[in-house]
C-alpha cells in the first residue's frame, strides 16, 4: 500500500544556519504545524491505512540541491511531526524507516513530498 502526501513548506539545513533561537523556533513550529495539519487531512481520507513497518521517503523539492548531510538534516522537524501523527518515535527503526531524496523544482518552488510504503493486511 502506497500513500503520497505533499507539504507546501520550505526546508532549510539546520547545520549551517546561524540565527537567533527564536527565529529557529518559529520556523520549526510552522513546519510542524503544516505537516501535522496535512497529515491529519490525509489520514481521514478514504482508504488511508498504515501498517507497520512503514517505509517513508521524504523528498525535498527546491530550486537548488543540498549536499546529502544537509538534505537529511533539513527534514528534522518534518520527520518529528510525521512520527508524532503516526504515534511512533522517529528513531524506532523497527516500525519506521526513513529515506531522504531531493529533486529540483521551479524557481521559487519549495515543498516536501512524503511517500509511505507499507505491506497491507
Language-model regions: role of each:
Residues 1-121:
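Catalytic phosphate/metal-binding cores of nucleic-acid and nucleotide-processing enzymes, i.e., regions
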Amino acid at each position: 500500500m502506497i500513500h503520497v502526501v505533499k507539504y507546501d513548506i520550505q526546508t532549510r539545513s539546520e547545520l549551517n544556519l546561524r540565527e537567533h533561537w527564536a527565529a529557529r523556533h518559529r520556523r520549526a513550529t510552522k513546519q510542524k504545524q503544516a505537516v501535522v495539519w496535512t497529515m491529519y487531512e490525509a489520514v481521514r481520507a478514504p482508504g488511508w491505512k498504515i501498517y507497520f513497518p512503514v517505509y517513508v521517503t521524504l523528498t525535498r523539492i527546491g530550486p537548488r540541491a543540498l549536499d546529502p548531510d544537509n538534505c537529511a538534516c533539513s527534514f528534522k522537524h518534518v520527520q518529528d511531526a510525521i512520527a508524532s501523527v503516526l504515534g511512533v518515535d522517529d528513531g524506532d527503526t523497527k516500525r519506521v524507516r526513513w529515506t531522504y531524496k531531493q529533486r529540483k523544482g521551479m524557481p521559487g518552488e519549495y515543498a516536501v513530498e512524503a511517500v509511505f510504503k507499507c505491506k497491507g493486511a
